[in-house]
UniProtKB/Swiss-Prot annotation:
Compartments, as annotated in UniProt: Nucleus
Organism, scientific name: Arabidopsis thaliana
Top-level taxon: Eukaryota
Polar residues biased stretches: 450-470
Tissue-level expression: Expressed ubiquitously in vegetative and reproductive tissues.
InterPro entries membership: DIRP (IPR033471), Homeodomain-like_sf (IPR009057), LIN-9/ALY1 (IPR010561), SANT/Myb (IPR001005)
UniProt-recorded name of the protein: Protein ALWAYS EARLY 1
């Protein structure tokens, strides 16, 4: 087996004796170090010496001999160097930063610190001598008569050298644990040893000592090393004893006549029987009450209370407690115990561990009477917790169960009740309810005690709740019995609840008052009338608008002045959608969104620069509109532009922002200036308001004419689209090409090419002949419609962004390219030589109005390009989608049936012609770059095999575009 583990605190008390020496040694080392530094520094430096030292140091830096000679007054080189080492950091600063005054202040502070440390060292030495002298003291040993009950305390080292500490330790029997260096030196109360000493000490001396200790603790304001110890002795039990003792001494001036008998009873105890804990469980509070009364007898102080009736009642209680066994039975009755527990309901926070063990020995001396009592109540007794409802037929509880229940973690006082008549049981439950009500009102203890009469018989009961209040101080008679019908509805017996906190009570009261006010509000006659939906919404809106933040948000969201409304009503994105005929579309496809994004370009980042630019634009717009309004007022024949709102005039009703409160108010315009106007508010008088803070009362009347027409047009388009919408289509809203054709654009785009229209139709026909699946046919039609819409959208976007001159170049180039490709295809299909083919191309160009002859090198190059693209795209005939790549078979002679990519050839020729046209004349670089983007988009092939060539073309065009954009001026 492993050896027995030894206690770690065997020799702990010797460490306390050695610790002062260690502290003294460390203090002495610090003192020696300071003395050594002071010796090097020499005598205290005067101000003149410091001034001379500073001047010499600035003059002879590092030459300490010259500095010492300049200082004079027998200052050695070592002293001067020591002074420099002490203030090295300060003296190293530049001459403008450091000064003589700073050096003098630092040395003055140094000397003051040295003086303070020396005075503290002297006090420390004196305390060490006192501690060593008092260390040899030992507490007085108790007489031999007490050694059987009291464990001899350990020898405790004196803390801070106070003899009264040892006296208090011996008197109240506090044991100090063996502690280490860092353990706080305050005493811990030992309950059972304290009670043993109190049992064998006279009650009058013990009470006087306790009162003296309490008085000293109350008078001591702080700073004493024993404050924590004295505060630990002031437990709730002792405070309760002291207050009750003072109260009892005034009520019983002649209580000294009982002192001898009480002292005899205390001295007759001897060795206490530990089995008295069982009786304490049965009559715990009765025993506690008896001890409180005896402490009250031993007191000699008087209180200020002059309640004579209360004094007589307390005297009756004391006489009942000293009565023989005849009255002991009535004291142990459940009714009397319930009264005791109710009187001390606010003092029951202590558990059984805090109850003194002297209560056990106090009842042990009356063993004969207790045995008789146990035999008398063994048959009908019952025991139950207070939370369990009381039953009439009680069961007998064994002694083992009582002991087991007393060993709980947080035990409660459990009383062995005696079966009483029905009236007593009901009275007890009624009195419990009454006590709970009184306790919740926080009434004084003596008021509750004065309202309760002693129960001298088992059939004693109280009358009504009103007769037992604090104001009514009558003693209820023994014959007053409460009828059974009055207390039948009182329910089971419950423990009175803890009094609530006053702060929570005030909070509950305030909440109750608010609830009452709400009830009063709802109890008005209008609350019975059911509000309509309109009135309910109006009330909610009024409540919402009562918040300032909501009103500010409404101003930012909906308040627009007459001068700013056209500017903010114009949205570039909405204008673009209306221009291409998609302003009425609630949803767009992915292809449409991609086209829109590519057309609008890259958006600007939301930054401070962007916001500042927008503000500058708005300010310029405002100034231009104000200038136009001023000219319009000066000239009677002036015409208002269709994109401007009608200006405000005198007498118009407006909604204006008050310049002081920044709240919206109704008003009327009195005068109009360039950018301000005088507004007469309905309730706030006349104020000068900016024109941007005035909104017409009816904004529709001041709307610009152009904006009004645009809104009407959008509404008409939306109405038409709503009528033409297919009811069964739940996917993306698709519009037929007729909708796009009916839209009147400002710039007429070129009609869709024949290949673009023919290609989806042919693709649908091929799929319809190869399969009979109806869903595939529908999908092909949908795809064709989307492609057609996308092409029209591209042409529209190009026409919108480019200048008219650039648009003419694009149209002319594509027309020439289409004629050349058609002539070349016809010539190739006819099988004639190169000269005949060239003649056919010239004829085609002359037919479309082209008067410039082409070089001979152009046509062979075009023809070579045609056959090259044809040979490249010839491999795509065997793919899964041959018709989707834009191939159209040219039916000529039966020998040559090679399909020709006419669309791609036309785009290439048109691109070449565009580049040739813009090179003949100088155009703006931005327009040229935009035209090149159009060329690159037109060259995009549909065959995947041509994508590498397209990437090369795209790269080359990007380089050219970058060089052109470098010529664009940026402001």
């Amino acid at each position: 087996m492993a050896p027995t583990r030894k206690s770690k605190s065997v020799n702990k008390r010797f460490t306390n004796e050695a610790s002062p020496d260690i502290n003294f040694g460390s203090a002495s080392k610090t003192k020696q170090r300071k003395k050594k530094l002071a010796d090097k520094l020499g005598p205290q430096w005067t101000k003149r010496e410091l001034v001379r030292f500073y001047d010499a140091y600035r003059k002879y830096v590092g030459d300490w001999k010259k500095v010492a000679a300049a200082v004079r007054n027998n200052r050695s080189v070592e002293m001067v160097e020591t002074l420099f080492c002490m203030n090295r950091a300060y003296l190293s600063l530049p001459e403008g930063t450091a000064s003589v005054a700073g050096l003098i202040a630092m040395m003055t502070d140094h000397y003051s610190v040295m003086e303070g440390s020396e005075s503290e060292g002297e006090d420390h030495d004196a305390s060490e001598v006192t501690r060593k002298h008092l260390k040899r003291k030992r507490p007085q040993v108790l007489p031999s008569d007490f050694r059987e009950e009291v464990v001899p305390p350990h020898s405790v080292a004196s803390v801070e050298g106070c003899l009264s500490f040892l006296k208090q330790t011996q008197a109240y029997e506090k044991r100090q644990r063996a502690t280490g260096k860092r353990t706080p030196r305050f005493l811990v109360a030992i309950t059972h040893e304290r009670d043993d000493i109190e049992d064998f000490s006279p009650p009058n001396k013990r009470a006087k000592k306790q009162l003296d200790a309490d008085d000293d603790a109350s008078r001591r304001g702080g700073g004493s090393p024993y404050r924590r110890k004295e505060l630990s002795e002031i437990t709730p039990t002792r405070l309760r004893k002291t207050s009750q003792a003072q109260e009892a001494q005034f009520k019983h001036p002649d209580s000294s006549m009982f002192e001898n008998g009480v002292r005899d009873r205390w001295h007759k105890k001897g060795a206490a029987d530990r089995d008295g804990a069982l009786l304490m469980d049965m009559e715990g509070l009765v025993t506690q009450k008896e001890k409180i009364v005896r402490v009250e007898e031993a007191e000699g102080n008087y209180s200020d209370d002059d309640d004579g009736l209360g004094a007589l009642k307390t005297l009756a209680e004391m006489s009942a407690s000293l009565a023989p066994a005849g009255l002991l039975e009535s004291e142990s009755s459940p009714h009397w115990e319930e009264e005791r527990k109710t009187n001390n309901v606010d003092k029951k926070s202590n558990t059984l561990e805090t109850v003194s063990t002297s209560h056990h020995r106090e009842k042990a001396k009356q063993a004969g009477l207790e045995d008789n009592l146990l035999h008398a109540i063994s048959a009908p007794d019952k025991r139950k917790p207070k939370s369990v409802p009381e039953s009439v037929d009680g069961n007998v509880v064994s002694i083992e169960e009582l002991r087991t229940s007393s060993r709980k973690r947080k035990p409660k006082f459990q009383v062995l009740d005696v079966v009483a008549p029905k009236e007593s049981t009901q009275d007890k439950s009624l009195y419990t309810k009454e006590s709970a009500e009184v306790d919740s009102l926080k009434t004084p203890v003596k008021a509750r005690r004065s309202s309760q009469g002693p129960a001298k018989q088992l059939k004693t009961a109280k009358t009504t709740v009103e007769s037992s209040s604090a104001s009514d101080k009558k003693i209820t008679g023994p014959d007053a019995v409460v009828p059974a019908t009055q207390v039948s509805a009182s329910g089971p017996e419950t423990l009175p609840q803890k009094p609530p906190n006053r702060r929570k009570i005030s909070l509950k009261k305030s909440l109750q008052e608010r609830a009452k006010s709400l009830e009063t509000t709802h109890d008005k006659p209008r609350s019975f009338k059911k509000l309509s939906e309109h009135e309910l919404l109006q009330e909610k809106l009024s409540n919402c608008l009562s918040y300032p933040l909501v009103r500010r948000w409404c101003i930012y969201e909906w308040f627009y002045s007459a001068i700013d409304y056209p500017w903010f009503a114009k949205m570039e994105f909405t204008d673009y959608l209306n221009h291409v005929g998609l302003g009425h579309a609630p949803r767009l496809t992915r292809v449409e969104w991609s086209v829109i994004k590519s057309s609008l370009g890259r958006p600007r980042r939301l930054s401070q620069r962007f916001l500042q630019d927008e503000r500058d634009k708005l300010q310029e717009y405002r100034e231009s509109v104000r200038k136009h309004y001023t000219e319009l007022r000066g000239c009677a024949t002036g015409v208002l532009h269709t994109d401007l709102a009608r200006p405000l005039s005198v007498g118009n009703r407006v909604i204006a922002i008050h310049p002081k409160t920044r709240e919206i108010r109704d008003g009327k315009i009195l005068t109009v200036d360039h950018n301000k106007c005088n507004v007469l508010f309905d309730e706030l008088g006349v104020e000068l308001v900016m024109d941007i803070d005035c909104m017409p009362l009816n904004p529709l009347e001041y709307m610009p004419e152009g904006l009004r027409r645009q809104i009407d047009k959008c509404l008409a388009i939306c109405k038409e689209a709503r009528l033409n919408r297919h009811p069964s289509s739940d996917a993306s809203v698709l519009f037929s090409p007729s909708v796009l054709e009916n839209v009147n654009f400002s710039m007429n785009p070129p009609p869709a090419k024949q290949d673009d229209i023919r290609e989806p139709v042919l693709y649908g026909k091929v799929i319809a002949t190869n399969t009979t699946d109806q869903s595939i046919v529908i999908n092909s039609k949908v795809t064709g419609t989307e492609i057609q819409r996308t092409l029209a959208l591209q042409h529209t976007s190009d026409a919108q962004e480019m200048e008219p001159e650039m648009i003419e170049i694009v149209i002319e180039s594509k027309s020439i390219a289409q004629a050349m490709v058609d002539a070349a295809i016809k010539a190739a299909s006819s099988g004639k030589n190169n000269e005949d083919s060239e003649n056919m191309v010239h004829q085609a160009l002359s037919s479309i109005g082209e008067h410039q002859p082409l070089d001979n090198s152009i046509v062979p190059g075009i023809k070579h390009q045609e056959y090259t693209n044809g040979s490249l795209d010839h491999h795509s005939l065997n793919t899964a989608e041959p018709m989707s790549n834009g191939f159209i078979s040219q039916e000529g002679s039966g020998k040559n049936k090679t399909p020709m990519p006419s669309e791609l050839i036309t785009s290439c020729v048109a691109s070449w012609l565009m580049m040739q046209m813009i090179s003949k004349k100088q155009y703006p670089p931005a327009d040229v770059a935009q035209l090149m983007d159009t060329v690159v988009n037109d060259l995009q092939p549909r065959c995947p095999q041509n994508m590498p060539i397209y990437r090369e073309i795209q790269t080359c065009m990007g380089l050219i575009k970058t060089q052109i954009m470098a010529l664009v001026r940026t402001s």
